[in-house]
Amino acid sequence: MITMMYKTVSLLACLLVIGMASCRNFDAKEVKIDSDLTLSGGETEWKKGFELSPLDSTKLSEVIRMYDLGNPDQVITLDKKLKEISGLSFDQKNNQILANNDEDGVIYYLDMEGRIVKEENFGKDGDYEGVERVGDNIVVGRSNGNLYFYDETSAETVKVKTDLKKDNDVEGLALDQQQNLLLLACKGAALSEKKSKREKFIYAYNLKLEVLHEEPFLVMPDAVHLSYVEYHIDDISQKEKEDLQKRVKSFAPSGIAINPINKDLYILSARGSFAVVYSANHDFQDVLFFDEKFLPQPEGICFSRGGDLYVSTEGGKSDGKIVKYSRR
């Protein structure tokens, strides 16, 4: 095992992953970056580090072709109650959209056209940032890491404190059904002070064990996203490329969702209006840039059962909106 400084690891990893993706003899599973910023061999579980692999050009094409981000299929103007919309998720049980804003302790049930069909009060006002269905419970995440389990049958709410705090700044919540985990995307610091500020983190709450795993579920290095823009986005001017890199540098997770079609993980950023995409195996896939005209401050993201993409944006001086991109 060879210990290296973070900058050196990031640079070498990105050159290998991004710049040399076409090298057939390079086996990505032999190189990983773990929580101690070391290079080592062999496979590893997700809790022990973030594994990089060469970008698969076919996979990238699939992601790019799946949605036409420049031409949304529908722009839905929301009720004024959702001007500050934050969390967004698809409710498979009722074929509805669940939403919350970042001020009120209210769960909003929307039809697929964005109309409010029901409201449920689950708690006091607070900075709420994500919503997901887990069985008969609707779970709402708060920026300080607390989870609120609202039982639809009894109309009672149970508050669960995790090890995440205000400094971690939880902004996104998603359900990983296959692993029975709630994923919490953090805009702020890592649980461990040893983690670099040039990375963002997702942590996992185990629903069966009722515990938050200390090691990150996913580590997202800024260097990987920047290298993608540098080496894999062509046919634009240098000024346009620099503008995209500036947007990527502002990466601040604001929402998270799993695509039901290929299980890719989409992590939304309100700053810069884009999303980064990682595979179910935690391999980086893509950066998707939204048109800021439609999504000036994207805060919530979800997918329908058929894979249509829905992204919400706060209203600012106007009303909140949900933008739909149909799966092609």
Identify the meaning behind each predicted range.
Residues 19-22:
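C-terminal motif of bacterial Sec signal peptides marking the signal peptidase cleavage site
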Residues 24-328:
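Sequence/structural signature of beta-propeller domains
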Residues 2-10:
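Bacterial N-terminal signal peptides that target proteins for export
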Residues 9-17:
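Sec-dependent N-terminal signal peptides
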